Amino acid sequence: MSDYLKDSEERMKKTLNVLKSELAAIRAGRANPALLDRITVNYYGTPTPLNRLATITAPEPRVLVVQPWDVSQIGEIEKAIQKSDLGINPVSDGKVLRLVLPELTEERRKELVKLVHKKAEEARIAVRQIRRDANDLVKKMEKDGEISEDERKRREEEIQKLTDKYIKEIDKMVEAKEKEIMEI
């Protein structure tokens, strides 16, 4: 596999991984510890990801339990969760925080599906931009006399196949997430 193709595939994989983590953070009907991945806590003056300060579990379908390793930080963790855009109020018993996730309304589910589609479109645009960069490189190689016109066309077809593969992956991820959100 050529360098330009390896580089393009690597960049497309990164785009897919970013989308995967963004989709994991979008809450569907059931509790998922990944919902709290983006929350940072002021830990002795340093912004620290919540998952580095506590164990996060989902003992029930609509409940998350946050168990801090340093119990003295429970107040800071509680504040960070309240400040987040999740719209969840944690309940503290002094040792652990319980987060009860409300049922999703039909309207909220539709909003989440729109958000999923927006994130997917951003990923598709990124993949197409990577394709454009690779095609520009191949055209430059032809212009500089490094490759023939036939070779350029063959390489552009390879790039297009790679692009199609990753666009299909994005579509599969979106379909699965949409199904998960709309499931009651």
Curated annotation (Swiss-Prot):
Annotated Gene Ontology cellular component terms: cytoplasm
Matching InterPro entries: Ribosome_recyc_fac, Ribosome_recyc_fac_dom, RRF_sf
Major site of localization recorded for this protein: cytoplasm
SUPFAM superfamilies referenced in this protein's UniProt entry, alphabetically: Ribosome recycling factor, RRF (SSF55194)
GO annotation (BP), single: translational termination
Keyword Cytoplasm: yes
GO molecular function: ribosomal large subunit binding
Location relative to the cell: Cytoplasm
Keywords in alphabetical order: Cytoplasm, Protein biosynthesis
Purpose of the protein: Responsible for the release of ribosomes from messenger RNA at the termination of protein biosynthesis. May increase the efficiency of translation by recycling ribosomes from one round of translation to another.
Family: Belongs to the RRF family.
Descriptive protein name: Ribosome-recycling factor
